[in-house]
Structures are given as structure tokens and as C-alpha cells.
Regions:
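Bacterial N-terminal signal peptides
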Residues: 3-16
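Hydrophobic alpha-helical and helix-loop surface patches within well-folded domains
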Residues: 18, 294, 403, 449-749
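N-terminal, polar/Ser/Thr-rich
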Residues: 19-261, 363-365, 716-721, 729
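Non-catalytic accessory/interaction domains
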Residues: 171, 180, 185-241, 281, ...
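Hydrophobic helix-coil surface modules that form long, contiguous segments used
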Residues: 228-232, 236-265, 269-275, 281-285, ...
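Glycine/proline-rich low-complexity spacer/linker segments in large multi-domain proteins
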Residues: 233-238, 319-322, 328-329, 338-376, ...
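Solvent-exposed beta-hairpin/edge-strand motifs
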Residues: 275-305, 368-370, 376-380, 766-775, ...
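Short strand-edge motifs at loop-to-beta-strand transitions and within beta-strands
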Residues: 317-321, 333, 784-790
Length: 813
């Protein structure tokens, strides 16, 4: 133990901690090079990191130059054609093995490689040096030490940018190596370049993935991600966030060009001991210029990143601060961020796009807290935001508005434009709907050119050219008249009525929402978003479905924009803003609940036929085939969340999370019954108010409402099949009847195809008999054929499989 303590103590003081020490030492980290004096010719070096096993069979191992007295990088490279290494990984769950197989073709990662660039703040360096001593073959190679850095130093420098802030933080904070991270970039094998990461900050610490370029865009494909073995067995603990922010007070100044200058104050609560570097997330479009802690300036660190995994696709920057003395865990401090930039774009037509809606202020996680927001903006504009409007004043070309939250919320946002507004009262609640006076440039109709005759030039033709296939009279194209642009304000009252109806429907069934006032406001584009008390709805949701451009869309898209999407985003006032999730693997719950809530409202508004038509469309989208002939639903289990989006299945994340998510809830409703299902939703809202809900929490809560005689009382089989696995079966029923009334023996077989033999489900059949009677029976099906018997009083006249449409399946007569 003593050597480790000595190393940790040395880390605390090896970096100079004078004014500006953070950026100075970040530069030292950025300048780390491979150490020519620490290059070894190696054979059979074994390194185990959690579930990952590395075998450096033959090649060179060269360490990076030490920083703060500690080695944080190393490179293995195969120097000869017969050299190489091997990485082996056996994911612990069926779901992750399926995911790995989807990308690599095998459920186990067993890849030979030529190079491995390693970065770490754990005990990897010590483990490698210990392994070197076990075989006399492993010797220093000065010649290779002189040769390798020239080629590999630029690569290491580039990759270090992704982890430099973590290296600095761990080094100066003197953390136990058990809480350190590990990352490796592997290349030279059949799978191309890929990354492995062990990040103690995450619930799923082990991650393997690859950056892919396809169809003119990047995808980060996470092959597998899971809890590390030592974390699962209690030998290592998940690392806490170093601090959290509470009670935001944000003052924003918008100039005439809508550039922002912001001062964001918050209560700063340190959590971990001996921490001198703290990281926050902020939009890439904003530049942090100054930070004060308890009124004193602290150093700002604008860094490249904090982890290797998915860094290239991160939409936000990781910014840090370096403090001279570590604050005491549990103490309270005031922090003040000064930053500026541009997150608002001009979409044309007096319409503005507010980007970076979740990162326009510094964050560390999404905890429920209070917000006080003040905006100063051009007087000709209107601005809405989360929270209750406290006051608005105007003068000298500037308008100022203050908003304050009355209940804790997770996210604060704003929107602006030139609005016309209407208000609806829903009991004690207020629904305000804003519409832009015009539409964005992309929705304005293009002018159609007119063809007109031009005056002849020179002498007239004496005879027609026999080779011309058009009149010899010259023509020219001139700009014709533009059709009038759509007017969002014409349907403002209709949008307000619909919004109020949906809001009232949800209040009556789910209970109190996140805030007492809700504002629906327009945003360019095709998608929306639901913040606490603030709904972003696309301009398309305001337009007449019988006029261009909506008139030219399929009927299902017109319904989506004008009814479903607004209802979905309003439902997020409950699902996401009262009840939330903390892990990405549970994020599907919020989208599925919002999607199905919109379907419940549509069912109440337009009847069950409208709901079933949409469920059929959702099923068809899940069954659509990609270029390899695979259905979208097969991309992975719904709990993979954002990981479902890949180059093979670009649409899979949305289709599975939203559409299959709605089907999962619809099937659950079929099991519980209508009353119990609605009671479940209300129970979740009440029991998880301002708390995080996990998938397993949801299963346990739903199990409380399962009928007593249900064969899967804890819903474990249901969740194992529909939530944690994939598959949509094709079902059919074969049957025959023997005997005479009043004792007719009915024998049936439920046939299940296009799914694995292990696929299990509960499917209902309805057996009709004369005179006009029927028996509704659930069948527990597994495998290709499941036999069932029923004794009837009368002969069957027909059998209907899943008559209430409560099973996600293709049904054959």
C-alpha cells in the first residue's frame, strides 16, 4: 500500500499549482511524447482491464513520457509481419452479445491487431511494467525507441485531446487508480480502427465502438456497452460526479444580430475530496470567457474532451475550471460563468431557430432545481421561456423579461420570434400558444417560371428547320408569380384548442404537470421538443393540412404534424419533466410514454380505429427492410436507445424507441386492462415525481397492476422478450373440433414463425360459437407450435387471433 500512497501524494504536488497552473499543465499533457528510453521488444504480455483481455503477442511496447511523475499513455505496435496482438471480450449479457454480433458478425470479440494506443489514469502502467519483468525476452530496444516516436507522436497528440481534461483532473486530485479511466484505440485488424473505453463515471463502464462514415455523415456505432465485471461484483465503485450545480440565475443579453452575452450564476456544491479540476458541458457555439468562484476569478480550461467514446460526435464542449485549493465536499459556494456566442439562427421570414436548447448554460447532469431567467433582447421581438413570467419592461430599443420557476425542473429553455398569441384556460392551468407572423424560408413556395414568346432577332426564318422538335418562335423563361406563403396565424385558434384539449386529457388522467402554465411556441424544422412549461412545435404544426405544403404530404404525415406531434410534446410535461430517467438505457421510457399518451388522446378524440391505424403504420415501419434485407426492428433491443442509430439502420433509433415503445405500452395495456393501465400511469407520475425511473422500476410498478391469474405475474418474461430482446413473430392458428354439444372438444395450434425457437409471448384468441357467443383466451406460446385445448358447449363457427390488436405480430389467417 505504501508505494501507491507515495505515488498519489507525489501527484498532488508534481504539477506546479501557481496562477494559470491548469492551462500550463494541460499544455504539458498535450506535449507528451513517446519516451525513446522506454521502448521494449516484447512477447506474450498480458493485460486485463475489467472484461477486456489484451495479449501483446509480439512487437514493441513504448511508454509515453511521464506527466506529474506518472505514465498515462503507451503504444503497442507490431514491427514485423509476424508480430501482433489480440483483444478478447465476452460481453456478459445476451443483449450485448447480440449487439456486438450485429456490428462484427460474432457475439464474442476476438480480434487480432497491429497497433494499440493506450491512455489511462488507472494502474495500467504498473500492470504493464510488472508483466515486462516476467520474461527475460522483454528488453529495452533503443533503436526502435529512436524510430517509433517520429511516426506515432502526432497520432498520440491528436488522441490525447479527447482525454486531456480527465488526465489533468485525476493527476492533480491524487485519486486512487481504482477510480481512473482506461481507453485504447485499436487498429490493423479485420474490423478496422475501433475504441475501447472503461469510464468509472458511467453506470455501463465498459464500451466498445467505432466511428463510421456513411452516406455523407458520421455515425458512432457502440458495439457493446455494459457494467464492468469488477463494478458488478463490488470490487470497484462507480465514480461520483465531482460537483453539481443548483439554483441557477441566468442573465442573457441578445444584441440586434442575436449574439448572446450571458452571466450564469449558480450554487456550486463539491462532492468529491481533493478535487481541483471541475468539468461542465456547454454548447460548442459558446465561448467561456470568465468564471468566478465566491467572487474570485478561477482559471478557465477550454478542453478538447473528457473521454474517447463518441467524442467526435459530441455536440457540446467539455469546459473546465481549475481552482487553487480543493473545496470541502458538501460545502456551498457561488459560481458565476461569463460566456458569449451565437445559438440563435435566422431561418428567414422573421422566423428564428434557437439551437443548443439543452446546453446554452453550463451543466453537469440534469438534476431538478430552480431557475431564475432574465433576458434583454431587441424590442421588436417576443420571447418566451420556462418558468412564470414575472415582469416585462421596454425602453431604448430593448425589451427585458424575467421568468422564475415555481417548482424544480431539469432543463430551462427559451424561444423568440414575432408572435401572435392566444390563451386557453384548463381549470387552474393556462395554455398559451404563440405563432410566428410568417414562415421560414424553406416553407415559402418557389416561383414557377413562365414561358413567353420573345421578339425575333434578325431576319425571320423562311422555312422551318426539319430537325427542330419545338416551335421555331424563340422563347424565354421569366420569373412567374409566387404563390402566397402559408400563414401560421390563420390556424392559431385551432392549434390552441387542440393543445388545450390534449393538455386537459392528460391532466385528468396523469395528474398535475410540471408547471401551472404551458407555452406552445414555434420552431423551424420538422421536430419538436418539450421543456418544462415550454413546448417547441414545428411551424408545420400550425399550417392548414389542406393547403401546401402539408397538402402534398401523405395523410399520416399531415396527422402527425397537426395532431400527434403537438400532443406528444405536451405529454412530455409529465414524461420527462415530472418523471425522468438518469441513464440512456432508460430513455426509451420517456419517448414511449409520450408517444402512447398522444395515441390515448387520439383514441379519445377520433376513436380506436384511428389509434389502430397508427399502430399498423408503426408495425410496418418496424418491419421495413434495410439494404441487407433485415427488418429495422432487428437493429437491437429498445434499451439500446441512441445506440440503435447506425450506418446500417439510420432510422432505427426513432422507429424502435418511439414506435416499438408505443407498441410495448399498448401490449402492456392489453395485459393489465384499461383501468389498471391508466392507474399505472398515474402511479408512476405520483411515485416518481421529480425522480428518475429505470426500466426495472417501471416493470416492478407495472407488476402491481397485473391480474391475479396472469402466468407472468412479475412481467419478467414480457420485458425479457419485448424490452431486452428483438423479434416480431408471424402468428397463425390451426384448429379442429370433435364431439357434439354440449361437450365439444376444441384443439388448436398457435403457429409462430420468423422468430427464434426461444421466443415467448402471450397471444389471445377469440373462439366464436353459435348462437352468437365467444370465448376470449390467452395462449402462452413458445417455439414454432403451441397446442391448446378447450371444451365448448357449442361448435366453433370461427376463430379470431388477437381480435383486440394487443400483440405486436404479423397475423395470418
Amino acid at each position: 500500500m505504501a508505494p501507491i500512497l507515495f505515488v498519489l501524494a507525489s501527484l498532488l504536488f508534481a504539477f506546479p499549482l501557481s496562477a494559470g497552473w491548469g492551462e500550463e499543465n494541460l499544455e504539458k499533457i498535450r506535449e507528451i511524447r513517446l519516451d525513446p528510453d522506454q521502448c521494449y521488444r516484447v512477447r506474450d504480455i498480458f493485460l486485463e482491464r475489467e472484461d477486456l483481455k489484451f495479449y501483446f503477442v509480439d512487437g514493441h511496447l513504448i511508454f509515453g513520457q511521464p506527466v506529474a511523475g506518472r505514465t498515462v499513455a503507451a503504444l503497442f505496435v507490431a514491427s514485423e509481419p509476424t508480430d501482433g496482438g489480440e483483444i478478447i471480450l465476452f460481453p456478459p449479457s445476451k443483449r450485448e452479445r447480440q449487439s456486438l454480433s450485429r456490428f462484427t458478425g460474432q457475439p464474442v470479440l476476438n480480434e487480432k491487431f497491429r497497433t494499440a494506443m493506450l491512455f489511462f489514469t488507472d494502474d495500467t502502467a504498473e500492470a504493464l511494467r510488472s508483466a515486462l519483468q516476467k520474461d527475460e525476452f522483454n528488453q529495452l530496444d533503443p533503436e526502435a525507441g529512436r524510430r517509433l516516436p517520429g511516426r506515432w507522436d502526432p497520432v498520440m497528440k491528436n488522441l490525447l485531446r479527447s482525454v486531456e481534461l480527465a488526465v489533468l483532473s485525476d493527476a492533480v486530485s491524487g485519486r486512487d487508480p481504482q477510480s481512473g479511466f482506461f481507453g485504447a484505440v485499436i487498429s490493423g485488424g479485420t474490423l478496422g480502427r475501433f475504441e475501447v473505453v472503461i469510464d468509472p463515471h458511467r453506470d455501463e463502464q465498459v464500451s466498445v465502438g467505432q466511428l463510421v462514415w456513411s452516406d455523407s455523415r458520421d455515425y458512432y456505432e457502440a458495439w457493446c456497452r455494459f457494467e464492468g465485471r469488477n463494478f458488478a461484483q463490488g470490487r470497484r465503485a462507480k465514480r461520483e460526479d465531482e460537483a453539481r450545480l443548483e439554483d441557477y440565475r441566468i442573465e442573457s443579453h441578445l444584441d440586434q444580430e442575436l449574439g448572446m452575452k450571458v452571466v450564469a450564476q449558480a450554487t456550486f456544491l463539491p462532492i468529491t475530496a481533493n478535487t481541483k479540476v471541475f468539468a461542465f458541458e456547454l454548447s460548442r457555439r459558446l465561448r467561456l470567457t470568465k468564471v468566478l468562484l465566491d467572487g474570485e476569478p478561477v482559471e478557465v480550461l477550454n478542453s478538447g474532451g473528457h473521454t474517447l467514446a463518441d467524442t467526435p460526435l459530441r455536440r457540446n464542449n467539455i469546459v473546465g475550471i481549475a481552482v487553487p485549493d480543493p473545496p470541502v465536499p458538501g460545502s456551498r459556494h457561488e459560481i458565476e460563468f461569463h460566456y458569449e456566442g451565437r445559438v440563435i439562427g435566422d431561418a428567414g421570414g422573421g422566423v428564428y431557430y434557437v439551437g443548443s436548447r439543452e446546453s446554452w448554460y453550463p451543466r453537469r447532469g440534469n438534476r431538478f432545481t430552480s431557475f431564475d431567467l432574465r433576458f434583454h433582447y431587441p424590442e421588436q421581438l417576443d420571447l418566451v421561456a420556462t418558468g412564470k413570467l414575472v415582469e416585462t419592461t421596454s425602453g431604448e430599443g430593448t425589451r427585458s423579461s424575467q421568468f422564475h420557476t415555481e417548482t424544480p425542473i431539469r432543463l430551462a429553455g427559451f424561444n423568440l420570434g414575432v408572435y401572435k398569441r392566444v390563451t386557453r384556460k384548463v381549470g387552474d392551468y393556462t395554455v398559451e400558444v404563440c405563432a410566428n407572423q410568417g414562415v421560414e424560408r424553406s416553407l415559402k413556395p418557389l416561383a414557377k417560371p413562365d414561358v413567353v414568346a420573345a421578339a425575333p432577332i434578325g431576319a425571320p426564318r423562311r422555312r422551318r428547320d426539319p430537325f427542330r422538335e419545338f416551335p421555331s418562335t424563340p422563347t424565354v423563361l421569366v420569373e412567374g408569380k409566387r404563390a402566397p406563403p402559408p400563414e401560421p396565424t390563420l390556424r392559431l385558434d385551432a392549434v390552441a384548442d387542440l393543445s388545450a384539449q390534449a393538455f386537459k386529457f392528460f391532466v385528468e388522467r396523469f395528474g398535475p404537470p410540471a408547471t401551472r402554465e404551458i407555452v406552445v411556441s414555434p420552431i423551424p424544422g420538422e421536430s419538436g421538443q418539450g421543456f418544462p412549461g415550454l413546448v417547441y412545435a414545428p411551424t408545420l404544426s400550425y399550417l392548414d393540412p389542406d393547403e401546401p405544403p402539408l397538402r402534398d404530404l401523405p395523410a399520416r404525415d399531415r396527422l402527425f404534424y397537426t395532431q400527434l406531434l403537438p400532443a406528444h410534446e405536451i405529454a412530455h410535461q409529465w414524461w420527462g419533466n415530472v418523471v425522468t430517467v438518469s441513464e440512456s438505457s432508460d430513455g426509451w421510457l420517456m419517448e414511449a410514454l409520450a408517444t402512447y399518451s398522444a395515441l390515448l388522446w387520439l383514441e379519445d378524440h377520433s376513436g380506436p380505429e384511428a389509434r389502430d391505424e397508427l399502430l399498423l403504420q408503426y408495425k410496418n415501419k418496424l418491419l421495413e427492410l434495410n439494404e441487407d434485407g433485415e427488418p429495422v426492428e432487428s437493429a437491437g433491443a429498445i434499451v439500446l436507445g441512441d445506440r440503435l442509430r447506425s450506418s446500417e439502420f439510420p432510422s432505427a433509433r426513432n422507429v424502435i424507441v418511439y414506435d416499438k415503445g408505443a407498441w410495448i405500452l399498448h401490449m402492456l395495456r392489453g395485459i393489465l386492462g384499461d383501468d389498471n393501465f391508466l392507474a399505472l400511469l398515474r402511479s408512476i407520475r405520483d411515485n416518481y415525481q421529480f425522480k428518475s425511473l429505470s426500466t426495472e422500476d417501471f416493470r416492478s410498478e407495472a407488476a402491481r397492476f397485473v391480474p391475479q391469474d396472469w402466468p407472468d405475474p412479475q412481467l419478467e418474461n414480457f420485458f425479457d422478450q419485448w424490452v431486452y430482446d428483438t423479434g416480431i413473430p408471424t402468428l397463425s392458428v390451426q384448429y379442429h373440433a370433435e364431439g357434439t354439444p354440449p361437450r365439444v372438444r376444441f384443439s388448436g395450434h398457435l403457429i409462430q414463425q420468423n422468430v427464434p425457437e426461444s421466443f415467448t409471448l402471450m397471444a389471445p384468441v377469440e373462439i366464436h360459437t353459435s348462437p352468437g357467443r365467444s370465448l376470449y383466451k390467452w395462449i402462452a406460446a413458445q417455439g414454432e407450435s403451441t397446442e391448446f385445448d378447450v371444451v365448448l358447449r357449442n361448435k366453433p363457427t370461427r376463430v379470431v387471433l388477437d381480435p383486440k390488436n394487443v400483440v405486436l405480430a404479423v397475423k395470418r389467417d
